[in-house]
């Protein structure tokens, strides 16, 4: 069996309320555990609409059929009215996920992190993580041991800002395999587990059409020579394309692919991991900068 980390990002109020229960049902049916990363503060995702002036973002929204994919309640959230508090309004759903799956922090305010984390000082970065962490821990009633920043908006500043929270791992960038980010003076930071595989919205309309996506993704997994990690979104695979995701899980099992929480990808001895950095870069199918893995050693 080929082991693949399954990361589930939950960005919005509707994704939490409607998408997560459907995903829990599907994962339970297939006997799969995953890592859920929750946004718990205000849902201001509609404020991304200003990015439509950027051709690359506009093309992404058009080719992914964003209005039918996400729904207007998501696309307009937090624009003409204050965004609803995601965690406070969906505590039972988040607790249900925590009963059977690994649960980590995605963001306090997903929109603000994507829009401003690149210029925030380190103190503000740490404050945003702390706000989300305290809220998520209050909801699930236990310490949160992992996190994954919104939109992979991370660099070495973010790595350093998160060091005080004692996470087991972070999943803040795109890359090929888990690594130890270097903080300077020979000191290593918290393990990073990069996402290695394309997401639905990155691939559909560019590399493949909707009908061919499952086959495309499974072929990517088979070719992945690193430590494969796949990200889905509660707003996509948990709502509009839940049936297609169900088919993907069936096909994966038939091809001896086993999805698992990200923590199960870590070695017993972290000294085996390569060292590296999280640097800014770009990725086909995604607008704007994101964190990319830059390996400095190959590891054992």
Curated annotation (Swiss-Prot):
InterPro entries: ArnD, Glyco_hydro/deAcase_b/a-brl, NODB_dom
Domain NodB homology per the UniProt entry, residue ranges: 2-260
Domain of life, source organism: Bacteria
GO MF terms held by the record: hydrolase activity, acting on carbon-nitrogen (but not peptide) bonds, in linear amides
Keyword match Aminoacyl-tRNA synthetase: no
An individual GO BP term: response to antibiotic
Recorded metabolic or biological pathway in which this protein acts: Glycolipid biosynthesis; 4-amino-4-deoxy-alpha-L-arabinose undecaprenyl phosphate biosynthesis; 4-amino-4-deoxy-alpha-L-arabinose undecaprenyl phosphate from UDP-4-deoxy-4-formamido-beta-L-arabinose and undecaprenyl phosphate: step 2/2; Bacterial outer membrane biogenesis; lipopolysaccharide biosynthesis
PROSITE patterns recorded: NODB
Reaction(s) this enzyme catalyzes, per UniProt: 4-deoxy-4-formamido-alpha-L-arabinopyranosyl di-trans,octa-cis-undecaprenyl phosphate + H2O = 4-amino-4-deoxy-alpha-L-arabinopyranosyl di-trans,octa-cis-undecaprenyl phosphate + formate
Keywords recorded for this protein, A-Z: Antibiotic resistance, Hydrolase, Lipid A biosynthesis, Lipid biosynthesis, Lipid metabolism, Lipopolysaccharide biosynthesis
Assigned EC number: 3.5.1.n3
Any GO CC annotation of this UniProt entry: membrane
Pfam family, one: Polysacc_deac_1
HAMAP family: ArnD
Role, per record: Catalyzes the deformylation of 4-deoxy-4-formamido-L-arabinose-phosphoundecaprenol to 4-amino-4-deoxy-L-arabinose-phosphoundecaprenol. The modified arabinose is attached to lipid A and is required for resistance to polymyxin and cationic antimicrobial peptides.
Family: Belongs to the polysaccharide deacetylase family. ArnD deformylase subfamily.
Protein name: Probable 4-deoxy-4-formamido-L-arabinose-phosphoundecaprenol deformylase ArnD
């Amino acid at each position: 069996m080929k082991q693949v980390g399954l990361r589930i990002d939950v960005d919005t109020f509707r994704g939490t309320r409607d998408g997560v229960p459907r995903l829990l049902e599907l994962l339970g049916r297939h006997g799969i555990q995953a890592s859920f990363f929750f946004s718990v503060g205000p849902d201001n995702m509609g404020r991304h609409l200003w990015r439509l002036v950027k051709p690359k973002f506009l093309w992404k929204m058009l080719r992914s059929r964003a209005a039918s994919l996400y729904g207007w309640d998501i696309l307009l959230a937090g624009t003409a009215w204050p965004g609803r508090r995601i965690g406070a309004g969906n505590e039972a759903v988040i607790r249900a996920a925590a009963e059977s799956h690994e649960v980590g922090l995605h963001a306090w305010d997903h929109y603000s992190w994507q829009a401003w984390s690149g210029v925030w000082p380190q103190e503000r970065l740490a404050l945003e993580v702390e706000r989300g962490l305290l809220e998520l821990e209050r909801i699930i009633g236990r310490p949160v041991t992992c996190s994954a920043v919104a939109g992979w908006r991370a660099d070495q500043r973010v790595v350093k800002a998160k060091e005080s929270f004692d996470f087991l791992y972070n999943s803040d960038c795109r890359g090929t395999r888990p690594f130890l980010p270097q903080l300077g003076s020979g000191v290593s930071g918290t393990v990073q587990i990069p996402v290695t595989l394309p997401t639905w919205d990155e691939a559909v309309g560019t590399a493949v059409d909707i009908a061919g996506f499952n086959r495309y993704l499974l072929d990517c997994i088979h070719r992945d020579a690193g430590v494969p990690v796949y990200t889905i979104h509660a707003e996509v695979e948990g709502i509009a394309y839940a049936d297609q995701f169900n088919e993907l899980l069936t096909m994966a099992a038939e091809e001896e692919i086993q999805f698992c929480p990200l923590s199960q990808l870590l070695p017993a001895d972290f000294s085996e991991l390569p060292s590296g950095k999280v640097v800014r870069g770009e990725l086909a199918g995604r607008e704007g900068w994101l964190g990319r893995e830059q390996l400095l050693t190959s590891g054992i």
